[in-house]
Amino acid sequence: MYVGAIHRVSDPEGFTKAEDEAIAAGLPDGISLPIHAATHDHGVGICIWEGPSVEAVSELVESVVGPFSQNEYFEMTVDGLP
């Protein structure tokens, strides 16, 4: 399933560092991040995740970037991805 996440970032430096470290360490089996994008000032991020459930994705994301942002999650239908 695809899960959309909107991040309203309060600490862009902390968010970016935490995200980069988590991606470098490797995501858990069954979860991938095919699309991630941010505004130029990194105040807002929009990601499309693939995972087993909204809960699984939100638990992972909150554990990594929760201290640096307020996050919303939605089950999504996505065109253009396998």
Give the ranges of each region predicted by the language model.
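Short S/T/G/P-rich N-terminal loop/turn motif that feeds into the first structured element of a domain
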Residues: 1-82
